[in-house]
Amino acid sequence: MSRIGKLPIKIVDSVKVDINDNIVTVEGKRGKLSQEINSRIRVRVEDSNIIVERSLDDKQTRAFHGLYRSLIFNMVKGVSDGFSKSLTINGIGYRVEQQGTSLFFNLGYSTQFEYVIPEGVNIRLEGNTKIAVEGIDKCRVGQVAAEIRSLRVPEPYKGKGIRYDNEVSRRKVGKSGVKK
Protein backbone atom coordinates (compact mmCIF):
# COMPACT_ATOMS: atom_id res chain seq x y z
CA MET A 1 0.00 0.00 0.00
CA SER A 2 1.25 3.46 -0.83
CA ARG A 3 2.23 5.40 2.28
CA ILE A 4 0.71 8.57 0.88
CA GLY A 5 -2.14 6.97 -1.05
CA LYS A 6 -3.59 5.06 1.89
CA LEU A 7 -4.14 8.19 4.00
CA PRO A 8 -7.73 9.48 3.94
CA ILE A 9 -8.37 13.10 2.97
CA LYS A 10 -10.41 15.05 5.52
CA ILE A 11 -13.18 17.11 3.93
CA VAL A 12 -13.61 20.54 5.55
CA ASP A 13 -17.20 21.67 6.25
CA SER A 14 -17.10 24.44 3.62
CA VAL A 15 -15.95 22.04 0.85
CA LYS A 16 -18.27 20.02 -1.40
CA VAL A 17 -16.90 16.98 -3.28
CA ASP A 18 -18.61 15.46 -6.33
CA ILE A 19 -17.42 12.29 -8.12
CA ASN A 20 -18.81 11.51 -11.60
CA ASP A 21 -17.24 8.64 -13.58
CA ASN A 22 -13.51 9.45 -13.49
CA ILE A 23 -13.82 13.17 -12.70
CA VAL A 24 -13.49 14.52 -9.16
CA THR A 25 -14.88 18.03 -8.64
CA VAL A 26 -14.13 19.98 -5.47
CA GLU A 27 -15.97 23.21 -4.71
CA GLY A 28 -15.32 25.59 -1.82
CA LYS A 29 -15.49 29.20 -0.75
CA ARG A 30 -12.56 30.22 -2.99
CA GLY A 31 -13.64 28.45 -6.18
CA LYS A 32 -14.06 25.17 -8.01
CA LEU A 33 -11.46 22.66 -9.27
CA SER A 34 -11.84 19.38 -11.13
CA GLN A 35 -9.41 16.57 -11.91
CA GLU A 36 -9.72 13.58 -14.22
CA ILE A 37 -8.68 10.35 -12.50
CA ASN A 38 -7.04 7.33 -14.15
CA SER A 39 -9.42 4.38 -14.58
CA ARG A 40 -7.17 2.16 -12.41
CA ILE A 41 -7.81 4.39 -9.38
CA ARG A 42 -11.12 4.46 -7.48
CA VAL A 43 -12.19 7.46 -5.40
CA ARG A 44 -15.07 7.39 -2.93
CA VAL A 45 -16.46 9.63 -0.20
CA GLU A 46 -17.00 7.97 3.16
CA ASP A 47 -18.33 10.00 6.12
CA SER A 48 -16.32 13.23 5.84
CA ASN A 49 -13.27 11.63 4.23
CA ILE A 50 -12.16 10.97 0.67
CA ILE A 51 -10.70 7.49 0.18
CA VAL A 52 -8.40 6.78 -2.78
CA GLU A 53 -7.95 3.10 -3.72
CA ARG A 54 -6.29 1.22 -6.56
CA SER A 55 -7.70 -1.74 -8.47
CA LEU A 56 -4.41 -3.29 -9.64
CA ASP A 57 -1.09 -3.67 -7.87
CA ASP A 58 1.39 -3.03 -10.67
CA LYS A 59 4.14 -0.42 -10.43
CA GLN A 60 2.41 2.27 -12.50
CA THR A 61 -0.88 1.98 -10.58
CA ARG A 62 0.98 2.25 -7.26
CA ALA A 63 2.57 5.47 -8.51
CA PHE A 64 -0.82 6.83 -9.63
CA HIS A 65 -2.28 5.97 -6.21
CA GLY A 66 -0.06 8.43 -4.35
CA LEU A 67 -0.20 10.98 -7.16
CA TYR A 68 -3.98 11.25 -7.29
CA ARG A 69 -4.28 11.28 -3.51
CA SER A 70 -1.90 14.26 -3.41
CA LEU A 71 -3.70 16.03 -6.26
CA ILE A 72 -7.09 15.65 -4.57
CA PHE A 73 -5.64 16.76 -1.21
CA ASN A 74 -4.21 19.90 -2.87
CA MET A 75 -7.59 20.59 -4.52
CA VAL A 76 -9.39 20.40 -1.15
CA LYS A 77 -6.78 22.63 0.50
CA GLY A 78 -6.79 25.08 -2.42
CA VAL A 79 -10.54 25.71 -2.51
CA SER A 80 -10.68 26.16 1.27
CA ASP A 81 -7.43 28.01 2.11
CA GLY A 82 -5.63 28.74 -1.17
CA PHE A 83 -1.92 28.71 -1.95
CA SER A 84 0.65 31.47 -2.19
CA LYS A 85 4.30 31.90 -3.07
CA SER A 86 6.35 35.00 -2.31
CA LEU A 87 9.23 36.27 -4.40
CA THR A 88 11.76 39.02 -3.73
CA ILE A 89 13.71 40.99 -6.32
CA ASN A 90 17.31 41.81 -5.30
CA GLY A 91 19.59 44.10 -7.27
CA ILE A 92 20.27 47.77 -7.91
CA GLY A 93 17.60 49.16 -10.22
CA TYR A 94 15.65 45.89 -10.32
CA ARG A 95 11.91 46.50 -9.94
CA VAL A 96 8.48 45.40 -11.08
CA GLU A 97 5.32 47.35 -12.00
CA GLN A 98 1.80 46.12 -12.64
CA GLN A 99 -0.28 47.61 -15.45
CA GLY A 100 -3.65 45.90 -15.92
CA THR A 101 -3.09 42.17 -16.35
CA SER A 102 0.63 42.48 -17.07
CA LEU A 103 3.78 42.80 -15.00
CA PHE A 104 6.70 44.82 -16.32
CA PHE A 105 10.14 43.88 -15.00
CA ASN A 106 13.32 45.99 -15.06
CA LEU A 107 16.03 43.43 -14.36
CA GLY A 108 19.25 45.00 -15.56
CA TYR A 109 18.75 44.17 -19.22
CA SER A 110 18.40 46.79 -21.96
CA THR A 111 14.69 45.99 -22.39
CA GLN A 112 11.77 45.51 -20.04
CA PHE A 113 10.19 42.09 -19.64
CA GLU A 114 6.41 41.89 -19.91
CA TYR A 115 4.75 38.98 -18.12
CA VAL A 116 1.03 38.46 -18.77
CA ILE A 117 -0.74 37.18 -15.64
CA PRO A 118 -2.63 33.95 -16.47
CA GLU A 119 -6.26 33.27 -15.49
CA GLY A 120 -6.85 31.76 -12.06
CA VAL A 121 -3.82 33.40 -10.45
CA ASN A 122 -3.73 36.68 -8.51
CA ILE A 123 -0.54 38.67 -8.15
CA ARG A 124 -0.06 41.22 -5.40
CA LEU A 125 2.87 43.63 -5.37
CA GLU A 126 4.26 44.92 -2.07
CA GLY A 127 6.38 47.87 -3.03
CA ASN A 128 8.31 47.37 -6.24
CA THR A 129 10.52 44.47 -5.12
CA LYS A 130 8.10 41.99 -3.49
CA ILE A 131 5.70 39.76 -5.43
CA ALA A 132 3.01 37.49 -3.94
CA VAL A 133 1.50 34.86 -6.28
CA GLU A 134 -1.83 33.51 -4.99
CA GLY A 135 -4.49 31.10 -6.25
CA ILE A 136 -6.46 27.93 -5.60
CA ASP A 137 -4.50 25.61 -7.93
CA LYS A 138 -1.16 24.70 -6.35
CA CYS A 139 0.32 23.57 -9.66
CA ARG A 140 -0.56 26.82 -11.44
CA VAL A 141 0.68 29.02 -8.56
CA GLY A 142 4.01 27.17 -8.52
CA GLN A 143 4.33 27.34 -12.30
CA VAL A 144 3.69 31.11 -12.42
CA ALA A 145 6.19 31.70 -9.59
CA ALA A 146 8.79 29.57 -11.38
CA GLU A 147 8.25 31.45 -14.67
CA ILE A 148 8.70 34.80 -12.92
CA ARG A 149 11.84 33.55 -11.13
CA SER A 150 13.29 32.29 -14.43
CA LEU A 151 13.34 35.86 -15.81
CA ARG A 152 16.44 36.52 -13.67
CA VAL A 153 17.68 33.56 -11.62
CA PRO A 154 19.75 34.64 -8.57
CA GLU A 155 23.44 34.66 -9.37
CA PRO A 156 25.82 33.21 -6.77
CA TYR A 157 28.28 36.11 -6.39
CA LYS A 158 26.19 39.15 -5.45
CA GLY A 159 22.81 37.44 -5.10
CA LYS A 160 21.14 39.65 -7.71
CA GLY A 161 17.96 38.26 -9.27
CA ILE A 162 14.50 37.02 -8.33
CA ARG A 163 14.32 34.50 -5.50
CA TYR A 164 11.65 32.81 -3.42
CA ASP A 165 11.37 34.23 0.10
CA ASN A 166 12.25 30.90 1.71
CA GLU A 167 14.99 30.05 -0.80
CA VAL A 168 18.53 29.63 0.44
CA SER A 169 20.94 30.09 -2.44
CA ARG A 170 24.59 29.17 -2.33
CA ARG A 171 26.91 32.17 -2.39
CA LYS A 172 30.41 32.04 -3.85
CA VAL A 173 33.48 34.06 -3.03
CA GLY A 174 34.78 36.13 -5.92
CA LYS A 175 38.26 35.96 -7.39
CA SER A 176 41.07 36.74 -5.01
CA GLY A 177 43.89 36.83 -7.51
CA VAL A 178 47.40 37.70 -6.37
CA LYS A 179 48.91 40.74 -8.12
CA LYS A 180 52.49 40.45 -9.35
Curated annotation (Swiss-Prot):
Single annotated GO MF: rRNA binding
Keyword Ribosomal protein set for record: yes
Gene3D superfamilies according to UniProt: Ribosomal protein L6, alpha-beta domain
Coiled coil: none
Highest taxon above the source species: Bacteria
Annotated keywords: Ribonucleoprotein, Ribosomal protein, RNA-binding, rRNA-binding
GO CC annotation: cytosolic large ribosomal subunit
InterPro entries: Ribosomal_uL6-like (IPR000702), Ribosomal_uL6-like_a/b-dom_sf (IPR036789), Ribosomal_uL6_a/b-dom (IPR020040), Ribosomal_uL6_bac-type (IPR019906), Ribosomal_uL6_CS (IPR002358)
Gene Ontology BP term (one): cytoplasmic translation
Family of the protein in this entry: Belongs to the universal ribosomal protein uL6 family.
Assembly: Part of the 50S ribosomal subunit.
Function in brief: This protein binds to the 23S rRNA, and is important in its secondary structure. It is located near the subunit interface in the base of the L7/L12 stalk, and near the tRNA binding site of the peptidyltransferase center.
NCBIfam families, per the entry: L6_bact (TIGR03654)
Full protein name: Large ribosomal subunit protein uL6
